[in-house]
Amino acid sequence: MIEKILKDIKDLFKVQDKAKFLKQNIPYLAFFYVGNIFSHHIRAYTGGDVIDKIFQGILELNTMSFIPSIHLTDILIGIGVAALIKFIVYSKGKNAKKFRQGKEYGSARWGTRKDIEPYMDEKFQNNILLTQTERLTMNGRPDNPKYARNKNVLVIGGSGSGKTRFYVKPNLMQMHSSYCVTDPKGTIVLECGKMLEDNGYEIKILNTINFKKSMKYNPFAYIRSEKDILKLVQTIIANTKGEGEKAGEDFWVKAEKLYYTALIGYIWYEAPREEKNFATLLDMIDASEVREDDETYMNPIDRLFEALEKKEPTHFAVKQYKKYKLAAGKTAKSILISCGARLAPFDIRELRELMSEDELELDTLGDRKTALFVIISDTDDTFNFVVSIMYSQLFNLLCDKADDVYGGRLPVHVRCLLDEFANIGLIPKFEKLIATIRSREISASIILQAQSQLKAIYKDNADTIVGNCDSTLFLGGKEKTTLKELSETLGKETIDLYNTSETRSNQKSFGLNYQKTGKELMSQDEITVMDGGKCIFQLRGVRPFLSDKFDITKHKNYKLLEDYDKKNLFDIESYMKRKGKAKLNRETVITRVQ
């Protein structure tokens, strides 16, 4: 008991913040003053014990002097009185029962304009548009650091909920950043491309539906080091799994990795610039003949690596190839068959041409305002591995350039609006990338039909990805997992409940009982039947908002869209012809004929 009291006294006078300590103890100076002058008053009496003096002093308060005494006894008694009062107040507060009036079962509520105001930029254009009334500033370093939030957004909405109309298009109309937009069916570039071009944006298009309406993309053009080779191989493996193949990295997959790494390493180091592409990789695989009955047989690729080993025994590609060659003839043949099956899409001549050279210049998106539209099919995922490779390289290239060239931050923010994110495929290490891109002025908007889509692709890492999105926008849907998690994160509010009772007998009696109970701010069934014009927006550290979806017709740039005027339709073929002529003019060398 004594130890507990001593501990309380020690905690009572524990000083952590001097300014706060002084502020909290100023009121107790009044008790010090009362104790000091009363001590001086009763000390003036002689005779009798202390109790008699105290009673006598109380009876003659009108004669008490109000001038503080500097006598040591009076000072000590004043301090003692103040300390006693403080200890009583502290003990009462520590042992007091905690009542939260009106919040007994939960304190959830909908956010108001006052809640979101600190997170919005005064200049409308410098915001991410989320709802009709809620926005998020693009400034990653606000004056008050506690209002800093990353710009990663998780957008969830079932088919027809307006993910493109209510989120993608409004944010493209802001035109404050460079954009990389996944464009299912290729309609967004047609409707928004002219607006962006007229406002100084350079348009880039990667089209995996119609290769003839696409700019060329060559992953080999972005290999800077051996680690980039490993990343490229990993992305190919992760997104080109055949039907029925084991999910784990079994022997065959590891062997394929070795072979791809060896060949790509050779191409990157030794091949001329015009041959650094997938066509060369396919040609090398086709030339890798293996004879089961003749282990000494050397195919053309064996001879290439033999010559390279003589020139440079410790070459990166040679090391990988020697590991691959440890396989016996029959095993090596099986590996080659697996490689051929995995890269079968490259047998299409148009795809080879698409990836023969590079026109996208991915590493320049953070240098100047650029809009890259990635057109993918929403029904066929055959060529989605190309998109996955592109995004993997894009994130790594921009992060490296921010660190190596710009001191950690790109001059132009790059926003990746990843519509139909589940159809892109697996981006290796995306859970780590999304956690680190913020500081480089890069952000990702992950747009899904249901949250379960993310878990299907990224498994245990899905929660990490969601956790790195400070903003969540729900546009509507009925997938159970999404509804359950959303309802739980909204929390519970405390409501009043009353019960009525009726007793039937000779004399009727009625009863009315009032009590409080907890209720979800919005239950799963209420979310399911939510008005089609409403959406739910959640920002980390702020109450959720039930608001109207953004009305794009009210945006000042709406008149620049094809939605407003069919004359604003973006002509992809015409644009690419103009870009082709401009490129030809830049690269043409004129020589004088004597």
Task: Describe the residue ranges of each PLM region.
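Conserved ATP-driven motor cores of ASCE-family P-loop NTPases powering translocation/secretion/packaging/pilus
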Residues: I434-I536
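Short alpha-helical interface patches
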Residues: L59-S65, T73-I128, E226-I236, M284-A287, ...
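General secondary-structure edge motif
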Residues: A108-W110, R135, K151-N152, K319, ...
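Conserved long hydrophobic alpha-helices within structured protein cores
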Residues: K123-L130, F385-Q393, L486
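Basic- and hydrophobic-enriched, low-structure N-terminal and domain-boundary segments
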Residues: M1-S161, R165-V168, R592-Q594
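Low-complexity, polar-biased intrinsically disordered regions enriched in Pro/Ser/Thr/Gly
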Residues: L136-P142, K241-F251, R273, D496-K516
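P-loop NTPase motor domains
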Residues: I2-K4, K18-F21, N25, L29, ...
